[in-house]
A protein has these predicted regions:
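Short, compositionally biased
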Residues: 1-127
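An exposed tryptophan-centered "aromatic clamp" motif
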Residues: 101-131, 135-182
Length: 182
C-alpha cells in the first residue's frame, strides 16, 4: 500500500444498481479534485442522500462506499477483506481499464503509472495530474458492464452520452444508464 498518501486523483467511476441514480462528487470541494485518505469516514452532505463515491488515491484505488438510504456515512475500503459487503458492488482497476466486480475490491501497485486518462487510453507515462479529458475515452460502469464513452463524439453531438468535463462538479448516472451532469 505504499504511495497511498501521495499523488491524489479523482477517478470518474460509478458504483450502480439498476433503477437507482448514483452521484460522483468532489469529496473535498475546498481542494478541487483531491481527497485526504487519512480520514476514515465522512458524513454524507445533506444534498447527497448517501449516494456513492469512488476515488483513486496515488497508486492504490480506494472506494468510498455508501448505499443510498442505508447509511449516512461512507467507509474507506482499504483492502480486499475490508470491502466485502453483501449488498455492494465495488470497482477494481487494471492497467488496461476498468472492471466491475461483485462484492469485491482490490488495489494494485502497478496501476496509475501515468496520468489516469492516458493510462486508460494507451498506457503513456506522465506526471500525476488531475486530467480533464478532451478527446479521451471514459468508461461508464453500470449493471456490471463497461460501456465506452467517446468524449469527442459527445462534443460533436454524435453521442447519446453527456459528460461534464469539470470533475469538481456533480456527475450523475440517470435512469437510462447514461452520464448526465447535475
Amino acid at each position: 500500500m505504499r504511495g497511498i498518501y501521495e499523488n491524489f486523483c479523482i477517478i470518474g467511476a460509478l458504483l450502480s444498481k439498476q433503477g437507482d441514480t448514483w452521484t460522483i462528487w468532489n469529496t473535498n470541494p475546498e481542494e478541487t479534485g483531491y481527497w485526504d485518505p487519512k480520514s476514515d469516514t465522512t458524513t454524507t452532505p445533506s444534498t447527497q442522500y448517501g449516494e456513492v463515491v469512488a476515488v483513486c488515491v496515488g497508486r492504490g484505488l480506494w472506494a468510498k462506499i455508501g448505499w443510498s438510504g442505508l447509511t449516512t456515512n461512507y467507509k474507506w475500503a482499504a483492502s480486499d477483506s475490508d470491502a466485502i459487503y453483501n449488498n455492494y458492488h465495488a470497482i477494481n482497476i487494471h492497467g488496461n481499464g476498468w472492471q466491475s466486480t461483485n462484492h469485491m475490491f482490490t488495489t494494485h501497485s502497478d496501476i496509475l503509472t501515468g496520468t489516469i486518462w492516458e493510462q486508460l487510453k494507451n498506457g503513456k507515462t506522465a506526471d500525476y495530474d488531475l486530467y480533464l479529458p478532451s478527446k479521451h475515452e471514459l468508461l461508464d460502469i453500470h449493471n456490471n458492464t463497461c460501456d465506452g464513452i467517446h468524449v469527442d463524439e459527445q462534443e460533436k453531438g454524435e453521442s447519446g452520452h453527456t459528460f461534464n468535463k469539470n470533475l469538481g462538479k456533480l456527475l450523475s448516472l440517470s435512469t437510462d444508464d447514461y452520464w448526465s451532469s447535475s
